[in-house]
């Protein structure tokens, strides 16, 4: 499957945290994705961009925090993460090039 331009709109960037690193040991990868992205779209985009087979996709929406800026309350943007589990034998190394 070849990657289309809309696939790059779905996947924003890889998430590199302690929890994401533990997920990679269980053959998984974590990506920040577009808020309107669905699980089938995320699966299709990962398979097309990285040439791997996806076993499952789980998503999490993190609500933006309320913070004060110059004494006035503001709200940070909501974020969506996708925990992508890969089939056995497939790997994605997101730490390359850091």
Swiss-Prot record:
Query: Molecular function (GO) terms listed?
Result: rRNA binding; structural constituent of ribosome
Report the InterPro entries cross-referenced here: Nucleotide-bd_a/b_plait_sf (IPR012677), Ribosomal_uL23-like (IPR013025), Ribosomal_uL23/eL15/eS24_sf (IPR012678)
- Which GO terms of the cellular component aspect does the record hold? ribonucleoprotein complex; ribosome
Query: Which GO terms of type biological process are on file?
Result: translation
Keywords, A to Z? Answer: Ribonucleoprotein, Ribosomal protein, RNA-binding, rRNA-binding
Sorted alphabetically, which Gene3D superfamilies does this protein's record hold?
3.30.70.330
Residue ranges spanning the membrane: these are none
User: What is the recorded function of this protein according to its Swiss-Prot or TrEMBL entry?
Assistant: One of the early assembly proteins it binds 23S rRNA. One of the proteins that surrounds the polypeptide exit tunnel on the outside of the ribosome. Forms the main docking site for trigger factor binding to the ribosome.
Q: Which family does it belong to?
A: Belongs to the universal ribosomal protein uL23 family.
NCBIfam families linked to this entry: PRK05738.1-3 (NF004359), PRK05738.1-5 (NF004360), PRK05738.2-4 (NF004363)
- Tell me the PANTHER family matching this sequence: 60S RIBOSOMAL PROTEIN L23A
**What is said about its interaction partners and assembly?**
Part of the 50S ribosomal subunit. Contacts protein L29, and trigger factor when it is bound to the ribosome.
Q: Which protein are we looking at? A: Large ribosomal subunit protein uL23
Gene name of this polypeptide: rplW
């Amino acid at each position: 499957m070849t990657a289309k331009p809309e696939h790059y709109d779905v996947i924003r960037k890889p998430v590199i945290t302690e929890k994401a690193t533990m997920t990679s040991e269980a053959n998984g990868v974590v990506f920040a994705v577009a808020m309107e992205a669905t699980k089938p779209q995320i699966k299709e985009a990962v398979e097309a961009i990285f040439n791997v087979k996806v076993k499952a996709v789980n998503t999490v929406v993190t609500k933006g925090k309320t913070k004060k800026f110059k004494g006035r309350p503001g709200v940070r943007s909501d974020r969506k993460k996708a925990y992508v589990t890969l089939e056995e034998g497939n790997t994605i190394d997101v730490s390359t090039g850091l």
